[in-house]
Amino acid sequence: MATRFSHQLFGAILVFLVLHPFAAKSATLKLESLQNLEHAQKGDVVNGVHQVKKFLKAFGYYPREINRLDDHFDDALEAGLAVFQQLYHLNVTALLDSNTIKAMATPRCGVPDVNINKTSNGGSNHRVFRIIADYSFFPGNPRWSMYQLTYSFLPDSVPVVSLQVLGPIIARAFQTWANVSPFRFRQVAQGTRSDIRIGFYRRSHGDGAPFDGPGGVLAHAFSPQDGRFHYDAEENWSSNPSGSQVDLESVAVHEIGHVLGLGHSQDRSAIMFPSFQVGTTKRNLGQDDINGLRALYRY
C-alpha cells in the first residue's frame, strides 16, 4: 500500500505545497490522546479521529470546506495523511502509524504547511506551486518592497523575558538573515511604529490564531508586509535550552523567515522545516533557506 500511495502522489506532493497566508488556529495533539488510533485505516470509525482531522485541517492537510469533523476515517483524511507523511519524510502509508502519530505530537510552528481544497467530485485537490526545491512561499509570493526594515517589541507583550535578555537574541536572529541577503534590520523603541512587531501572547490574543498553551504550537508569524511575529507565552523558553526548554533564538530565526515571505520547507535541515526538537538549538540557515530567499527576491 505504501508503494502505491507514493507513486500516486509523487507528482502532487513530493514538491512542497502552498501555505495559507495566516497562522493556523491551534489544534495541536498530545501523544497520549492518539495511542488508541494506531492502525486505524479508511472506513474505520474510532473515537478520537476527529482530533486528527482538526489537526490536519489547522495545518492545511484537510479541506477547509469540511466543517463537520467526525470520527469516520474518510477519503479526505487518507489523502491528508499521505501528504503529511510525504512532507515529514515518513513512510507514505496513509495510515495512523506510530511514526506519524509521533510527528503530529512534535512541537511546531503555527503557520500552516499546505493548502488542500475539496474538489467538486468529493476528492481533495493539492495546490502545487513549485516542482523542484524544498522551500515554499505564501500564496501570491508576497514580499517586502524594501530591504531596510525596522522592528520593535510590542508594549502589550506578556513579560516572559526581559528586553535586556531578549533584545540581543532577536538581534542575532535578524543578523542571521542579513548575513545572506541584502536585508538590514534596525530596532526602534518599544511602541514605535515599525515594519516588524514582536511579542509574547497567551491563548486567544486577537489575531485569529490562538495559542494552545504548553507544547504544540510554539510561535507564529505572518507574511509580508504584515510584520507580526508572536511567541506563545506559555512555553518553557530559554536562551540555552535543555530538557523540555525551547530555544528563543532558533524559533526567532524560523519565524523571521516567515516575516520575510518564506513558507515551510520539506528539508529537515532547513530552518524553515515546520517542527522543532525541544532542548536543542537550530540557529543556522540551511542552503534551502538561502536559496528560497534568493528565489523570492531575485537578488
Language-model features: locations:
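Zinc-dependent metalloendopeptidases
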Residues: 2-299
